[in-house]
Swiss-Prot record:
This is Synaptobrevin-like protein. PROSITE patterns: SYNAPTOBREVIN, V_SNARE. InterPro entries: Synaptobrevin-like, Synaptobrevin/VAMP, V_SNARE_CC. It comes from Schistosoma mansoni. Keywords: Coiled coil, Cytoplasmic vesicle, Membrane, Synapse, Synaptosome, Transmembrane, Transmembrane helix. SUPFAM superfamilies: SNARE fusion complex. Residues 18-78 form the v-SNARE coiled-coil homology domain. Belongs to the synaptobrevin family.
């Protein structure tokens, strides 16, 4: 027997082949979409971790800023105290210098008066002896 194939007999084969190609394309797209969804989930996880680290860094930065401000004020006061002590020392040094200079002047005046008194005494005794 002779079997004659017509166009209608070949149509199911072509349709079946097209269906298989379409199914293969759908499977490929599904695989790509699964990979993309996995990547999106991984990125979301990474972003969540990064967000947590950013929050921790922000909290640490705020704490650092507060402690840096306290430290700045502490050293500012230390600097003020040091300048006050230095100022007092300079004033004391100036007072000591003034007292020393005044006492030196006083000593010179006293020595000058003492020596002029001796000179007057010597002259008067010399004058008395001549008469």
């Amino acid at each position: 027997m002779l079997h004659i194939t017509t166009m209608t007999d070949k149509a199911p084969i072509k349709t079946n082949k097209r269906l298989q190609q379409t199914q293969a394309q759908v499977n490929e797209v599904v695989d790509i979409m699964r990979v993309n969804v996995d990547k999106v989930l991984e990125r979301d996880k990474n972003l969540s971790e990064l967000d947590g680290r950013a929050d921790a860094l922000q909290a640490g930065a705020s704490q650092f800023e507060a402690s840096a401000g306290k430290l700045k004020r502490k050293f500012w006061w230390k600097n003020c105290k040091m300048l006050a002590v230095l100022g007092v020392l300079v004033v004391i040094l100036i007072i000591v210098l003034i007292v020393w200079v005044v006492s030196e002047q006083k000593n010179k005046v006293e020595q000058s008066e003492h020596s002029s008194h001796h000179l007057v005494m010597d002259n008067s005794s010399h004058l008395l002896s001549e008469q």
